[in-house]
């Protein structure tokens, strides 16, 4: 039965593809605007409302679908306080042969996911509420859980540039500057006031130090890039490789957290049936190669040019869809995304070129370099020395080895002029330790 359903789906998709109209694509020139409302609901955070707009300039149209520059503004908030304020600009024509990327953002996330260190070495317990009564812990399985949440506020400012090597328009050298201010605290949502979170247990066990709950990070980046993609935002064929070394000297806080990371991303795109289908995959890895990284800086993937709203890793909409957000964190990690991008139907509306697409996908990742693993093993004993925890399981260390985290899903895309991509992805983890619910993500752009 399942095979028949898959066959009918593929047959329908193929029929839709070849039934597309043969209208000549409109060549865009000058300014182009893509405004969209931001609307959502979360039972804890309330209603989400706001607006987002993509602004393009195509110049005389000779480079279409490439643009001279693109700007994006998003302002959205929930009625209970979580908010996003972001501007980014992608400029290809301000300086000769130079791409300039600017990103400035402020995030208030009052329900930020935290599932512990080192992937499956941490413990995932659904729907538990942990309370502290005087010097004792006790667990209630009937209360709504706040165990895997905390409050995070982040300020981000990034500038990156890339230029081609002489006589070679596929190879680039790149540099970047970054600044991050991260502040973590206990969950700040009404209805959970008396509960203890995993973050607080980590703080009590000193797995997260007192000087790591907030901090500033300055970044100096240098990288090499190879790019043979036919389109930057909606590629059908080509290869993209980015290798970056990021130095983070402690210039502001004086806490002594100086560190360096190495990040590599390799993406390829293979098209067939006249670009109506594209098989795409991305391999990525990041490791700390020198120094001591603090907790507040550990979850950031240090690439030069951003596709998604956040760069948190691993788990969630920008890395491992279907996996608990920030569910796979360590000093080093690796991941894979593989997709079959099906362009089901193309049409023209309000003088814009549109494509409707589907993209079934598979995501996988794991921690390759652990963070305070020995301390994590001893953390529960540290808590037992401070509190009475009789009858309460170890919620810090699972005694399990890390292994591959995997998820399957499918996305729906609405693409305008090969550049503005409205994305809806649904995905589910294949292991219940990564979450047992179907997760839905609404946003912009392919993840790679």
Language-model features: locations:
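Gram-negative/organellar outer-membrane beta-barrel architecture
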Residues: 25-33, 41-216, 314, 318, ...
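C-terminal outer-membrane beta-barrel translocator/porin domains of Gram-negative envelope proteins
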Residues: 220-223, 231-352, 368-370, 394
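Sequence/structural signature of outer-membrane beta-barrel proteins
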Residues: 56-60, 74-80, 107-111, 180-184, ...
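Surface-exposed extracellular loop regions of Gram-negative outer-membrane beta-barrel proteins
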Residues: 51-73, 221-265, 409-415, 420-426
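Transmembrane beta-barrel domains of outer membrane proteins
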Residues: 54-56, 90-92, 160-164, 223-227, ...
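Short loop/turn motifs that connect adjacent beta-strands in outer-membrane beta-barrel proteins
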Residues: 20-32, 59-68, 94-100, 166-172, ...
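Hydrophobic, lipid-facing positions within transmembrane beta-strands of outer-membrane proteins
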Residues: 33, 49-51, 83-87, 153-159, ...
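Transmembrane beta-strands of outer-membrane beta-barrel proteins
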Residues: 33-35, 69-73, 99-104, 171-175, ...
